[in-house]
C-alpha cells in the first residue's frame, strides 16, 4: 500500500477493533463482518468501475457513503455497512489499495472472532498445516490456482477437502484465499498464519526438522529465537527426513540452516 492508503487502513483497523470490542457478541459479529467484507471484495473484483467510484476523489465523502448505502443497505449487517462507509470516507492512493484494505479488514474480523472464542492459536496452527499440505499435494494446489476454472468451483473443491477437519474461521479464511490473483493460495495461507500470530504478539518461525520435535524442544527453540530476534516467536514444525539431522529455521525472509544435509552441502562447496 502507498502512504495515504496505509494511514487510511490503520484508522480503519482501530474502527473495526473498537467496534468488535464494544460488541456484546464479538464472536458472531466478527465472523459475519469478515464474511460479508469478503463478499463485498468479490463484487469489487468483478466490477472495476464500482471500485473506482468508491474512491473517486472528485466525489465528496458523503456522496461515496451514499453510494455504499444504495448498494449495501439491507443486504449486509449494519456493522459491515459502517466499516465500508468508513472506508470510502478515507483518502486512498488508488482503488486497488481500497479493495486490498477491505480484504485485510475481513481477515482481521474473522481472526478477532477466533480470538474471542479462544481459538486464535488453533486457527494459526491449522493455517500453517494447510499451507504445508498444499505444498506437498502439488496437484491440489494447481487445481486451486487454476485461473481457467471458476473461482466458485475452486472454492467448492477446497471446502470438500476441509469439511469437518478445521474450525469455521480457518475454513472461511482459506476459502477466501482461493481466487485471489496476486498470490498463490500457499503464500496467502502463510500470510494469514503470520497475521494470526501477530494478533497474539508473535512472529512465525517455520521449522523443518529431520524428525519430530518434542514440546520441550519446541519451547527451547522458541526461547533461543526470542533471544536472537528480540521478539516472541511461534514455532511451527514439519518433518523432512532428507535433511538427515538437525533443522532449517525460517523467520520471515531469514533462513538458519542447521541441518546435516545443509552442513554437508556447505562442506562440498568448500572443497570444490
Swiss-Prot record:
Cross-referenced InterPro entries: ATP_synth_OSCP/delta_N_sf (IPR026015), ATPase_OSCP/d_CS (IPR020781), ATPase_OSCP/dsu (IPR000711)
Molecular function as annotated in GO: proton-transporting ATP synthase activity, rotational mechanism
Keyword terms: ATP synthesis, Cell membrane, CF(1), Hydrogen ion transport, Ion transport, Membrane, Transport
Entry-linked PROSITE patterns: ATPASE_DELTA
Gene Ontology annotations for the cellular component aspect, listed alphabetically: plasma membrane; proton-transporting ATP synthase complex
Entry-linked Pfam families: OSCP
Gene3D superfamilies: N-terminal domain of the delta subunit of the F1F0-ATP synthase
Main location: membrane
Compartments it resides in: Cell membrane
Disulphide bond pairs: none
Topology term for the membrane: Peripheral membrane protein
Subunit structure: F-type ATPases have 2 components, F(1) - the catalytic core - and F(0) - the membrane proton channel. F(1) has five subunits: alpha(3), beta(3), gamma(1), delta(1), epsilon(1). F(0) has three main subunits: a(1), b(2) and c(10-14). The alpha and beta chains form an alternating ring which encloses part of the gamma chain. F(1) is attached to F(0) by a central stalk formed by the gamma and epsilon chains, while a peripheral stalk is formed by the delta and b chains.
Protein role: F(1)F(0) ATP synthase produces ATP from ADP in the presence of a proton or sodium gradient. F-type ATPases consist of two structural domains, F(1) containing the extramembraneous catalytic core and F(0) containing the membrane proton channel, linked together by a central stalk and a peripheral stalk. During catalysis, ATP synthesis in the catalytic domain of F(1) is coupled via a rotary mechanism of the central stalk subunits to proton translocation.
Family of the protein in this entry: Belongs to the ATPase delta chain family.
NCBIfam families reported in the protein's UniProt record: ATP_synt_delta, PRK13430.1
Protein name: ATP synthase subunit delta
UniProt source species: Corynebacterium urealyticum (strain ATCC 43042 / DSM 7109)
Organism placement in taxonomy: Bacteria, Bacillati, Actinomycetota, Actinomycetes, Mycobacteriales
Gene: atpH
